[in-house]
């Protein structure tokens, strides 16, 4: 190369290096803008998610918010409220990357106070640049995205709308985000909570939940996997293979062709436990119970004994074998010796506790002491077991005396005499 060409080569090299440096600087700026735009898009998605949660919260609590707001005084919804009610996940942060905090201000519509409208506004933190506000307002997908540039007015993306913050009782500053939720938007949210969706909506289990009774108009529910309910009322039949109940089963009547097995008690409040065909109650474990096989007797299954620490009471008690008592035999009713009785062989007691037995149709003592009574009266002497003449009087006076039981076996004794002086001795067996 000639010496006079060297300067041109150096100049060309420097120019090339300058161009490369300019391209690098330009590319770095483009990359910086790209990264910044992606960050703003992420912020817009977070605002959209927050606004969607606020929209659902308003729809769910529409009536409550109507009662706590006016056309000028808002009901304020915070991030904490949305997290506590499950509309936002517990990990959602209270502030965004710039330290701004989102809140929703809900008021009644001035033209139609029965309707609600709301605005989501960010406050505090570091203001966004205008470029970021314009970009984020366009990227917000829930509600109408906007921004606050003068601290008093919310302006929509592409300046499509403008609303004073004071209309919603909201306060903020320059460089903050605003999202408008119109009356139509919130009415739709309220309807979402009342509409039953046929398919599952991720994150919205409330859309598959009924909040009132449903009338099927006598139509069927077919191909049901499981029916979970607190109670059930059926005017017709219930057909099935098996049934498991952890609580009560109630009905006017029930018919079972085979067996009914209960893990607990079977109770009847006002009715009977009715069996038929010589059946009754049976304890399967021990083989005892009660049944009737005729119209007269309640019988013990397998001739089992009946045991109780209380009383067994009846009109009469009959033992075909021996009658045992582990203590004493107490006869409560009393009889009178000499009174009539039937049948022979009855055992009783008098009022002093002495044992009497029915002998020949008359209550009489069993063993005991003889009581002798001497009587001088004439005529009826009384009731005694036996009477005899104890004294006749004077034989030289041709005196006679007679003692007789009349009628025979009646224990009624009489004394007859010609003159006085005859004494009768009568015996009573105590």
Swiss-Prot record:
Family matches, as Pfam families: Shufflon_N (PF04917)
InterPro entries listed in its UniProt record: Enolase-like_N, Shufflon_N
Entry keywords, A to Z: Plasmid
Signal peptide as annotated in the record: none
SUPFAM superfamilies: Enolase N-terminal domain-like
Superkingdom as given in the UniProt entry: Bacteria
Region spans: Variable region: 362-430
Residue ranges of the region described as Constant region: 1-361
Additional notes on this entry: This protein is expressed by a shufflon (= clustered inversion region that works as a biological switch). The orfs of this region share a constant N-terminus, while the C-terminus is variable.
Designated name of the protein: Shufflon protein A'
Lineage of origin: Bacteria, Pseudomonadati, Pseudomonadota, Gammaproteobacteria, Enterobacterales
